[in-house]
């Protein structure tokens, strides 16, 4: 079995962060989202992975390399334009050959990984196995319709009137039968080759398509709110570790201070992770905050936020529920609001009331 990881797309819902960074490389708990998926694939016993890349291919390739750090062998497949999930399968046809494969969306996060899903697929080997979860607003997703016996009878991409609340999670397992389905597709009204149409073709052609409804946590980290929520979830399971320098501080709960970091005269309430080389002085860092490497936080309060590497936050009364990019400077401005809620792209310069 191989894996096909989709790491293209423009990440419009995470702009301005993704103007300068691939969305799959935005970190959660100081580790890129894509890396969690690659680790899950390796844990499922898969060793060969094709990574579909677009305009950010150089950045993705530099981060992942040959895949050996994950126990994988990575091959990069260039998709010139984001023309749908089924189009990614189409351009990967030669790479996939006659192997079964798992298709994994690189900006998705699934608690517990995919090992159990892969084991079930290997044992039963349906033509397709789709991962489903119940959502409050299925209109934003591909939606599956099941019959009274729990069999998949229909799929629809982002329907105006959903027939169920079962959304397709960004993990699919296929036999080579999917290639016959993709070959028959025509572009949808969105101008894309839809994987839901390909799976529907399998259903209509009498192939076995099995659902797997997950009860665990899944998020598409394509927007800031979901990114912050996944960051919260990962930090909740972190183990406390103090490898850096801590002086005259109050440290409470699950706090990670990486080697080379310095925290002085501050209060840190976990779960929190503080990256290598970061200096925090006279500040409060509250729960569910990730601060990347080589940052400066001085005389400020921050909580429930993600701060990327080399950012500087100085003299700011309070920041919460924010995603702050690389090399950002946040400093006081004359007036003082109660709190600041920010999404700042790399190299931004922002003045904020203190």
Regions found by a protein language model. Give the residues of each.
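Left-handed beta-helix
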Residues: 177, 184-354
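Active-site glycine-centered loops adjacent to acidic/histidine catalytic or metal-binding residues
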Residues: 9, 107, 134, 223
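A structural signal for short hydrophobic beta-strand segments in well-ordered beta-sheet cores
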Residues: 25, 144-146, 211
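Conserved core of the sugar-phosphate nucleotidyltransferase
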Residues: 110-189
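A conserved hydrophobic position in a structured secondary element of the catalytic/binding core
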Residues: 55, 173-174, 222
